[in-house]
Structures are given as structure tokens and as C-alpha cells.
């Protein structure tokens, strides 16, 4: 069978609002065709929203919203800054409901809604929620890109009167503060752009747009902040407000607002949804003495009714409650991933105060959950209510049900991994839950304290992410965010979207760091390796080039000396800025790597001049690197730390002066540097000393040189640093520090680089020169006391399955190769690979284990 990849521009497709239907069939080796596939359809996005206008309750001018991206940290405490934010019109902070009545008096063939509600929206037609997404649209830098969503609403329209209803919240579009906030920024007051296209069976068409004919009123959401939580007063609900027949005479006409500055783009990435739910695992009633003590440690007043629920899983999301009580009674939900010594919810490390408050309307069972805010938590502290069946002398509301809603991007999981080592299996689950918690509109660092898109994770964890999730739609949006964040001079900030500009003493390193900004250049190539799709490289090549040229302006004799270095490296000191490895070494090595990736990109786009120019630059950088950081006699780089030696080994930067006086590759020196790296790991008790940046290079360098047995020893234990200690501690997501007791977030995935090793070494799967897995390598490494590995990986060509076992010195591999692909298989102890085509294969060999020499 032969299936060819083709990218079709489809220039003959010119009309928006029309469906284009397609289906496929294939022919086998005997030229016998298959049945036709089911029909699929797509449509071209409309060129704009026709006559739709941005509408809301108040204009930016009338709202008196401060401008700028420097409102964070100590800046927020300045009197003039506080005064500016306090002067904002309260209407600009509020959630509003908008409604529009319209008629459809003919038979409807199809109806499609296009909507952008900022910061977040909930859209209903005739009282029914449209779609199942949360926090729509995905957030962005609204000065650069604004995303909208499209829905088929044919089945939701009715003959006669219809009502479109939209609930708006602040999101990242309008971070006003009020409780905890990492930052404050406002692109404008909540706003809506809407267009509903109705095609009738008789060939005619109606369009319902957002304009000054819409009406609005304040919603029952009395407070909503992406950082601080959400309050809801059910007494303010207006029954039927989003249905036909409602009397909106008291509602106010909307105002036409200034449009956001960003380009309107269709949201192509999968939406964020409620993907999992967790019930109560354990209930703990707090005593009056515990509450009194906890009030001091948490810096808030805690009601004497308080009890704490352990939901069993740390996650990103919010609670959903069903409660019964009297009108006006309030239930407060405080969420946290940790507890104080007294057993109360502890937000000290994750940003306080964040909570949810629900005011009852007193009409039987009431079910509610937040709409526009989320947090990272495991525990829920309930105040002002009692559990069903408990004594209730104060006649408090009765909590009949409560669940934790795990909210994350709905991109598909494409792999599975299991082995005979319980620590590795559990570590894989820890990483998965942490990634999912931080896989929101962007890849965030944590789901509570910051919620910012720190970029080092995108490429340092990139291979692991691409092994585990379908990023075909998510990655392009990540790249657009990075392109939007890039400065005019080519600089790349450390976060995208860049909601805050880090300035001031000690903050410059956070503003930009090549280990973070390099994702702009590295990640598109990782995407290309995985999917065989070079579109991101071609689309963002100029951005990549501008960043390299910018770094060149920051270099002194080809040495970069700024950034965070090996952030959070490990040792007998407080984690944070790089301590074991010089920042210039890490920055310059990444500078070289970024240039090398740009050279690959230049070859793909066919720019021979750039290939020559940047090859010369790369040579200058690697020479300067060796002159500055190499200690030839000691066979080490920099301080001789693990990161210092792993980086040049991983990047093939180990050179020495030849007889001609110039620098050339020195394999003898390379072997000595590698041996020193091994010695350092062993000297630390087979433990790492690298950090957020160096972890990947250490693990992959050891793997590349055949030291997988050492990697196994490094992580097959229950001590720090290692995943086993976190598991023993009771963590259910990967923590920011190897020792969770040291504080910081308990829901970070930045230390999850081991997942790459699980797949490319233990499973042994990686793309070959034919990118996109049309041709791929299978080279499993049976290390330690592993008895088996079972794994699968869904490529664009189909599912690869790897199942190996070892027993009595015999290694047995079962392999399934997708149609139209080739696997290059290297079995343990064998040097010569073999190629096998699609189908199921079995191999049995005697075990041999070696450490490769470079």
C-alpha cells in the first residue's frame, strides 16, 4: 500500500459560509479499493464578522482603565498605582449578561454562530449552553491576536422567536485584582463580538450581529478574577433571561466599544473542558481550637462550621456543589493543594486569597460551579454549610454533593506507557497530571500562583509532550503566542503571552533568558520531527531569524551572559537562580543550539545564504565557548558540574586545538569529559545536581552515550532528588522542588523530562530521518531489573505498539508497525539495525548490555 502526503492549497475554495464535504478511500497492494470513509466537512472562516460590532456595558475611555504591563509585585503597592486601579469605574470590573431577540420564520437548513467574548464567555441559545468548553476563547495577547469560536447551532434554533444570551467574565483580558493577583492588566472592559448566520432551505439567509440593538444587565457574578476566584449571588438570577418571552424592559442598551487591537483569528486549538471529576476521599472537621490557630496562619477569618475535604487528586479546576438552604445564606469554598499544621487549607505558597462564595436563592437543590476562574488544589475547605446527614444546630445550608472538576485542554492523549517498575509508572502518572493541570490556553508553569506561559517548558519538555499528546492543533497556537510576544528588536520574552514585563532589581533575568526564548526556534523543529509538517518553520522563519540576530547583538565575543541559567538546580542551598553552573555557560550553549536549529530551518525554507552565514556564526560561537569555558587538562567545562559537562556533550560542542592551531572535534577529550560527568553523578550518590534546564541535557546525554543503567539508578529510589520521594510524600502531581517540604508549587511539570527517556530509551521509539514517523527507530533499552515495558504511540500514520519482556537472559520484543511505515529495529546487544515494514513482528535475542563510547 502506498499513501502519499500532500498539502493542498485548495485555491478553488473561495466561499465562506459554505460547507465543503470530503471523503477518502485507499487501494491495497492488489489495487483493491476500500469502502469510502464517512463524510467529513469543513468550511472557510468568514473574512471578518460582516457588520458585527464590539459591544458591552462601558467604553474603555469611560472606564478609566490603566494602561501598561508593569503592574506586578512591588509596583502594585505604590500609592499612585493603587489609586489608578481604584479609580476604575466599577462597571468595568463586573460580569454582564447580554441578550438579543430575533426571529426565524422559515425552515432552517443550517445555522452557524461565530463568537468572541472577552475575557471569557458562556453562550446560550434559547436557554441551552452552546458547546462544552470552559474559559473560551483561549487566552492570548489581545493587542496582537484575538481568538473566536464557531458553533453549529442548527438544532438549537426554533421557529419563531429565539434568544441569544451571552455571559461575560474578565479572564486575562481584564485582570482587576481584588484578592490575590499575580499581576494586573486590562485590555478593556468585558466585550462581545457576535455573528449568527442562518441559511434557510429556500436559499435565503439571515445574519444576526452584535450591535447597539442588544441589551445587557449585571450578572449574578458579583466578583470574578482569574487569580482571585469568583462570587455568585443566586438571588440576582433572572429566570428565563436567555429565553423567549422574557421582559427585558429594565435592561440597558449596550454601548459600542472600541475593538481590541489584535488580529481576529479562528481558534484552531482544542478547547479547554471539564475532562475529569473527583469525589470526596476524606472529610475532616476542624475544631474551634484548630480554626482559631488557622486564622492566624492563613490570614483570614474562618467560620466555625469549617470542614476540609480531601478530593484525592491535585488538579487545576474548581468545585461544583449541590446545596440546599435558605435565601441569602452563603457557602464559602477555599481550595488549596496543601494544609496548614492545623489541617486548614493553606494557600501561602500558591497565592492567597483565592476562594469561591455562593449566595443561595433558597429554591430547593441548587447546583453551582465557577465559570471564569480556576485554581490548583486538592483540598476544599467548606465554610457556612454542613454535610448531608450531619448535625445542624445552626440551620446552615446542607451540602448534598461536591465534586472537583479537573479542567484542561482537550487535546487527545496519544500514548500509553507501563513497565514493571512501580516508581516509574507512578512518576509517569505524576507528570501526566501535572502537564494536564498546566495544559490550559497555554502551557502554564502552575495553575494557581502565576498561570503564565513560561517558555522553557515548551522545548525542554517538548519531546515528552509530543510523545504523549496530539499537539497538531495546539502547537500552532503556541507558536502564534510566541510570535505575538516577540519584541520589535527581535527579543523574546520568557513568557508568552507577555502579560507582564519584568523590570527592576533582580527581575531582568526573568524578563528574557535564551533558555526560555529559544523555544521560538527549537519547538517548530520538534514539531516537524514528530509530524513531518514544516509549516511552522516556514511561517515563523523570519521570527526565528530575528531572534538569533537579536541574540548576536547581546553577545560579547560570541558569549552570552544573561538569563536564568540552570534554574532551580539541585544542591545544599535554596533553589532558584543557577548555583552549580555559570549562567554564561548555559546561555552561550543555548545560543549555539538555537543557531544550529535555525540552520536546519534555513535548509528547509531553501535559504542557502542563511545556511552559510549562520554556519559561520555557529562555528564562531562554539570556538568562543571552548576558549571561555573549557579546562582541557581537567577534561571539564565551567565548574565541572553535571550541567556544565552535559550541555557541550549533548550539543557536540567538545573541541580542542589541532596541529594547525584551529579548533576541531576531539573524540578523545569528549570521552574524558563524559567519564567526568559519570564520576560526578556517582560522587553525588547516583543523584543529579541539574535543574529545570539541565535535567534534559543530563538525562539525554547519559542515554546517548549508553549510560541508561545509570539513569535507572538515578531515579529508582525514594530519596531526593527523585520522583520516588514525591510519591512517598503523597504527591499526586509533579512538584516544583524535588522535596515538596521546601515549599513552592506542588503542581509543576518543569521537572518532568524523564518522560522523554521513558519513551525514547525504555520503549525505544524515536523518529528517523524520515520525519513524521513514516520511518522510525525502535531501540529499547532493558535496564536495571525491568521485566517488561508495554507502550503504544499513535502517529499520524497509525498506532505503533511496543511490548517487550525479559526472562532468563532472553529479550523478547513484540512490535506493531503501522501501514505505509518502516521501523528500523536495533535489539539489545546488536549493532546492526534491521528494517521491517508494516505488520506485527516478534524478535528474540540474548541480552547484552554495553555503554557506548563516543
What is the meaning of each model-derived region?
Residues 111-115, 125, 318-337, 380-385, ...:
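Alpha-helical support elements that line or immediately flank enzyme active sites
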Residues 120, 191-193, 211-218, 387-430, ...:
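Active-site acid/base region of carbohydrate-active enzymes
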Residues 184, 191-195, 208-241, 268, ...:
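Non-catalytic C-terminal accessory modules of carbohydrate-active enzymes
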Residues 128-137, 141-143, 341-353, 472-577, ...:
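Helix-terminus loop motifs that line ligand-binding clefts
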Residues 164, 232-233, 450, 468, ...:
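C-terminal capping/lid segments that line or modulate ligand- or cofactor-binding pockets
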